[in-house]
Amino acid sequence: AALAAAGYRYNSSINPTWIPTRYNNLRAPCSVSREEGLTIYPVSVSAPFRVPLFWISLHVMPLPLYKLLCRSALRRDGHLNLYFHPWEFSARLREPAFGVPGYLTHCSGTDLQRKFIRLLEWLKARGCRFLTTREYLGCDE
């Protein structure tokens, strides 16, 4: 209710998965829904096991596995809602001063950029369209 009262039209912060000490949203819907005046657009998870397809997953999973999980979400939901942070694509992520764990830095910077481009090319070849959240949900300005 607070988000709608503040003028927001959608909430895309729901991760419908279970991650120890972070999320326990296994009962949350995986597709677009409505709640308290807001459109809920959850982050994509695989089917049927709800493996999160968020930014960490692309870092740590082999691309063929990530694609397989994306395919399962596409079949169930008809869309993917993926998010990444700009800093993940920086080569500076590997610098000790940033204190980022090695499991994230081994595929960051240009390595992650290349992996991401291959993912986008694969999605495009499958006929996927790329839209902003606002376009996909049909939210007015």
Regions found by a protein language model. Give the residues of each.
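Active-site-adjacent pocket scaffolds in enzyme catalytic domains
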Residues: 1-83
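C-terminal domain-boundary segment and adjacent tail
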Residues: 61-141
